């Protein structure tokens, strides 16, 4: 059987909502909304660029990545290769929105760094996320905390994928508002069903007592 490589983009789905991850990567459901369509257009624009070299830095676009160790694979938007010795590899990811408190985008960047380290036999100490909406570039240290968080997510997401299990909706209802899978997921109906069965179980317990 072929080894399954988890798409790096799936880690962001998992970090946002494990159910969203499972709907896309276990059940193969996908529904595009304004946010996903806009994000796709942005990546197509970034992907168009040819490699170029300026002031000791080579800029490589749409670089394919793979880690045999962590069983992840994907494509990164931009890799800066600083050509002085020792060479420095600096991943850059483009996002349509603005910087976030949560690590969703940083996890994706860290997974890219893990692949580069394995493929190039190097250590990646930092990368950057460029936010289209705010025209801001956030430098991200690839530190021990981010690495641990990213590796935890890789392992848990991989297990869910292997088990074919779809978790319940996130407790954080605000995330559902911008979720491209809201119509397919029907989180409110699922939550109501869960509340109904919970109440039934509660009264069943009282009858027994
Ligand atoms: S609608 Fe909410 S619970 Fe469902 S996948 Fe999206 S974020 Fe998760």
Identify the role of each PLM range.
Residues 8-9, 76, 106-110, 173-177:
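Non-catalytic, well-ordered alpha-helical scaffold segments
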Residues 3-6, 41-46, 61, 110-111, ...:
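Short amphipathic alpha-helical surface micro-motifs
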Residues 4-7, 102, 143, 164:
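A diffuse structural propensity rather than consistent per-protein peaks
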Residues 1-91, 95, 199-209:
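Metal-dependent nuclease catalytic cores that hydrolyze phosphodiester bonds in DNA/RNA
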């Amino acid at each position: 059987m072929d080894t399954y490589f988890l798409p790096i983009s799936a880690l962001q789905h998992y970090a946002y909502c494990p159910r969203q991850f499972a709907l896309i990567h276990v059940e193969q459901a996908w529904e595009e909304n304004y946010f996903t369509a806009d994000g796709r257009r942005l990546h197509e624009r970034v992907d168009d660029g040819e490699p170029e070299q300026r002031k000791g830095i080579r800029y490589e676009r749409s670089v394919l990545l793979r880690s045999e160790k962590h069983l992840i694979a994907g494509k990164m938007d931009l890799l800066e290769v600083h050509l002085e010795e020792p060479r420095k590899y600096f991943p850059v990811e483009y996002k349509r929105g603005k910087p976030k408190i949560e690590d969703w985008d940083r996890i994706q960047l860290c997974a890219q760094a893990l692949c580069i380290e394995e493929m190039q036999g190097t250590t990646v100490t930092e990368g950057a996320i460029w936010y289209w909406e705010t025209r801001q570039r956030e430098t991200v240290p690839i530190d021990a905390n981010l690495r641990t968080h990213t590796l935890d997510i890789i392992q848990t997401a991989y297990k869910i994928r292997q088990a074919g299990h779809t978790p319940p909706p996130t407790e954080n209802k605000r995330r559902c508002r911008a979720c491209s899978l809201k119509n397919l997921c029907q989180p409110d109906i699922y939550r109501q069903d869960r509340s109904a069965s919970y109440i039934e179980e509660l009264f069943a317990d009282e009858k027994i007592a």
